[in-house]
């Protein structure tokens, strides 16, 4: 049934690339491409990349997690870029800005241009999204309400997930 992504720009830069709209996934693509919102230079080694957006996903009316996966264009003959953790797994309760850990495996810096898409979002369970809803920057939206998981990034809970006691 219905799977939807909700993308909210959190900076003025992101607003330029994500105008409020509802996009119907007519081609039934599994992944939702995500833009870089500014020009970047990725140095050799580990780089942290801000995406300037918050994202939520729901399936059948219930909030669900999603994955961040590299697009095939991220690693080419001209540039050797990978996501540091292979696939980013975003918990349903995470309500903060999306960020990437990208490793430049090359010996030289790599230029990334604004509006270039390096990654895509895939809904938990690999459900094909029906709609991508782009929200206004300061819009109050229930799926971004504070949660116990919150906005902490990159393993910030310091706990071992469902196995903790």
Swiss-Prot record:
Signal peptide (from-to): none
UniProt main location, coarse: host cell
EC code: 3.6.1.23
Location within or outside the cell: Host cytoplasm; Virion
Class of enzymatic activity (EC top level): hydrolase
Cofactor(s) essential for the protein: Mg(2+)
InterPro entries: dUTPase-like (IPR029054), dUTPase-like_sf (IPR036157), dUTPase_trimeric (IPR033704)
Superkingdom of the organism of origin: Viruses
Gene Ontology cellular component list: host cell cytoplasm; virion component
Function in brief: The viral dUTPase may play a role in lowering the dUTP concentration in natural infections to minimize misincorporation of deoxyuridine into the viral DNA and ensure the fidelity of genome replication.
Family, per entry: Belongs to the dUTPase family.
Protein name: Deoxyuridine 5'-triphosphate nucleotidohydrolase
Organism for this UniProt entry: African swine fever virus (isolate Tick/South Africa/Pretoriuskop Pr4/1996) (ASFV)
Lineage, broadest ranks: Viruses, Varidnaviria, Bamfordvirae, Nucleocytoviricota, Pokkesviricetes
């Amino acid at each position: 049934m219905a799977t939807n992504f909700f993308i909210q720009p959190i900076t003025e830069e992101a607003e330029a690339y994500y105008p409020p709209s509802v996009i119907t996934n007519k081609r039934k693509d599994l992944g939702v491409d995500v833009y870089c919102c500014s020009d970047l230079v990725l140095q050799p080694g580990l780089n942290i990349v801000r995406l300037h957006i918050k994202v939520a996903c729901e399936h059948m009316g219930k909030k669900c997690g999603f994955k961040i996966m590299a697009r095939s264009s991220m690693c080419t003959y001209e540039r050797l870029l990978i996501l540091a953790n292979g696939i980013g797994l975003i918990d349903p309760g995470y309500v903060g800005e999306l960020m990437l850990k990208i490793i430049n495996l090359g010996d030289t810096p790599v230029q990334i241009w604004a509006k270039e898409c390096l990654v895509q979002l895939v809904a938990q369970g690999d459900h094909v999204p029906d709609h991508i809803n782009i929200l206004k920057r300061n819009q109050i939206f229930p799926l971004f309400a504070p949660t116990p998981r919150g906005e902490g990034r990159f393993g910030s809970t310091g706990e071992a997930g469902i196995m903790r006691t």
